[in-house]
């Protein structure tokens, strides 16, 4: 859910009871969900069931994330992030700990889901993500720290959800949080200015990560050439190659543009190989001295050819129907 390269800000065991200073709501820690530079998230049980509670010793960080969630909640359509439930302080042994409580989104992280269900789901889910990013960008925000750990797949019906808004930044400011593998500055030296193209670079790297679950380290200067070679070395990525490269090179004007490009790749992702007709074998033409032709023999031969032609047309028709059903299935998953 969050970066775990920094030191834990807190380490409370399961069973710890948190009582809000102002609103007096009580939460019991069930387990740790993840932590990062700006706080730690616990699964807690409150009066309304299981929820996620993020705490920090920085009131600025908590306030910033609360403002993001409040902003997201005002956007029409499918929720862009977890629903905000409570904001309060907790006094623990003379220390004031700031926290907020949000909806606990149950599901599987994106990487694990694709590994379990198959890479064919990657394009469908990333297209959903791009729809959400388009809405986020139109509200003046950039997600910033986009990576599979911050993306949960719920359902069925399967739907991708963002679960950690800690890196979300107002458009035009410096990115607050990032993870190197998905960072434009790390790979190509691009700026870490919060703008849609920064998120789209990360989306391209997420697709690469789905094909390389263990990721890989930067070699030498770690320029675009290394990324091109990585894309070209995986058959799963070839149908998305143009979309990924355009995202990495900053050629898309919006998340919507990348989504259109991605869907074009999906529509041609599984061409059905039609059976190749067998080469005709030339047979010696019988002469009158060997075999005398008869009307019944000619009729049977023509019927055989007609049957072969009929079978071929049936095969073509079946292939067309299967292709149409696949396209309808893909677009149905995107709705």
Q: Which role does the model predict for each range below?
A:
Residues 5-7, 26, 30-31, 37-67:
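ATP-binding glycine-rich loop module of kinase domains
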Residues 82-98:
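Short beta-strand micro-motifs within the conserved protein kinase catalytic domain, predominantly
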Residues 93-109:
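Conserved short submotifs of the Hanks-type protein kinase catalytic core
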Residues 125-126:
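Activation segment signature within eukaryotic-like protein kinase domains
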Residues 136-154:
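Catalytic-loop of the protein kinase fold
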Residues 249-273:
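Terminal C-lobe "cap" of eukaryotic-type protein kinase domains
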Residues 273-335:
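C-terminal single-pass membrane-anchor helix
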